[in-house]
């Protein structure tokens, strides 16, 4: 079934059918006649034809660093909610925190017909920025502050600062820290700097406390905690850069006969599902990941509709969750 055939059956011009399909100006009488024929014939416009007419594919590219992380499903839920309402398809790619793979994905989306790209970024290298600059569509960054593109992110620095201040408030003087790679400006560098500032205010030098690095997983958190214990240093409180790392650290401590929070007070950050199913519940910081997905989707649609729209930077709030582990 073609537009010409629909037009002939409805007794209107092909141009009238095209205006109907694109929500253009049309008399109510013609609109009703066309709608009746479309319903009777179960006509579905060709996606290719629609793209040729509107120059829009109704497809959005999305890249996430780790599909099974605590944050990615929430971000995707927010994006999907908005895109479903606007009849957009989401083309999802998962880089598994592999930088070379992520760069290849950007190259793929350069060659694909998408109306916009949402990048949930953990690292933004010069190669990332070069490839993003070659995109022929709007770009929105989630999870990192970025001057070059519209972005949605959390205040990792302030959240980490507040949590470390809380851990030290009860008289603890032997803190430790398990972070992630500081090339990740949000979870790595800014959380580290927030902790460092809180320690400085307590007259503790960050470089003198036991520190380890993990890679966002429970197992790596467990291994990092084991390395901290092997130093023999006294630790009475521990800040972990993610909830999953914190759960791994707690698992290790229990295997070594230590109790949380009686022996060591522990906090994470992010407030994923694991924080609340743990016993006792994990002290953490609630980040609004679903909201970040909603906001990113709205920003990309705004830029698709108005390519000249100014870039926007949106920092979301957070909520301290003082629960059972600290």
What residue ranges belong to the model's regions?
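Hinge/beta->alpha junction and helix N-cap segments in small-molecule ligand-binding domains
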Residues: 64-74, 92-101, 152-162, 178-226, ...
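Central regulatory/effector-binding core of bacterial HTH transcription factors
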Residues: 81-126, 130
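N-terminal helix-turn-helix/winged-helix DNA-binding helices
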Residues: 1, 39-77, 85-88, 96-98, ...
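Short beta-strand segments enriched in small/hydrophobic residues
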Residues: 14-16, 52-68, 166, 174-181
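Flexible loop/hinge segments that line or gate small-molecule binding clefts
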Residues: 120-162, 182-183, 244, 270-282
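N-terminal helix-turn-helix DNA-binding module of bacterial transcription factors
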Residues: 1-58
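Periplasmic-binding protein-like
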Residues: 114-120, 176-179, 211, 232-242, ...
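Flexible loop/turn connectors
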Residues: 226, 230-326
